[in-house]
């Protein structure tokens, strides 16, 4: 019999490894049962930097601040990745998602979900998460449960190619990835907990940093002409 828990963890480790290897290494986790494979994969990755924020609404705004910081510190800006469990937890992200959309700030939303057979039957903490954020996200990617994915590394590479393009748009914004997990959520055999993933090669060459402004020329211009300096978002 196939160990669904081992498949869940291995798939999550592959996904987190792929994200980190593309330079997306900041995670904000709101702990919950259904998202355990994702949270554990982040905690085990030595290149991942993560914060644990119990309240999902607060976590989303904290992640928003992290993404805003990258606008001035990296070129291009890189997304902060949010992780939470299923149900109403996901809905608590909405205010920050709206702000990220209008401020053009990159966020990657990884929501754990119940499998399809637990929808529309009154299961606990089960809502229609696909399309929950509507027009406030640049894209939504509903995925099948990991135990239904035949070639996980190949499919994750294909997904990351799409995500990387979408996350580095000229007008970035939030992207939603919805991931249903079947139980058991973790491996039945303890030795399966030690599984690790091979690194993923960069999907795109890194962009050169933005050139620094010519402050001397700017100073001469200001000295010889009357002008107005505007600071802040336009």
Residue spans for each PLM region:
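N-terminal alpha/beta PP-like core and its mobile active-site loop of ThDP/TPP-dependent enzymes
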Residues: 2-234
């Amino acid at each position: 019999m196939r160990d669904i828990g081992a498949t869940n963890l291995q798939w999550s480790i592959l996904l987190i490894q792929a994200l980190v290897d593309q330079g997306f290494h900041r995670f904000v986790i709101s702990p919950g049962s259904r998202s355990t494979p994702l949270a554990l994969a982040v905690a085990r990755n030595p290149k991942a930097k993560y914060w644990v924020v119990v309240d999902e609404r607060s976590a989303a705004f904290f992640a928003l601040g992290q993404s805003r910081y990258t606008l001035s510190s990296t070129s291009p800006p890189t997304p902060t990745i949010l992780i939470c469990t299923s149900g109403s937890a996901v809905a608590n992200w909405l205010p920050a998602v709206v702000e990220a959309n209008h401020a053009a700030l990159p966020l990657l939303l990884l929501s754990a979900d119940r499998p399809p057979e637990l929808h529309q039957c009154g299961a606990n903490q089960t809502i229609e998460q696909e399309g929950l954020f509507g027009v406030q996200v640049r894209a939504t990617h509903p995925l099948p449960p990991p135990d239904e994915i035949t070639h996980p590394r190949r499919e994750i590479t294909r997904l990351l190619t799409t995500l990387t393009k979408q996350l580095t748009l000229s007008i970035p914004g939030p992207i939603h990835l919805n991931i249903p997990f079947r139980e058991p959520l973790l491996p039945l055999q303890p030795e399966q907990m030690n599984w690790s993933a091979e690194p993923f090669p960069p999907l795109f060459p890194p962009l050169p940093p933005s050139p620094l402004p010519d402050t001397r020329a700017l100073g001469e211009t200001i000295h010889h002409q009357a002008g107005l300096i505007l600071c802040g978002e336009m």
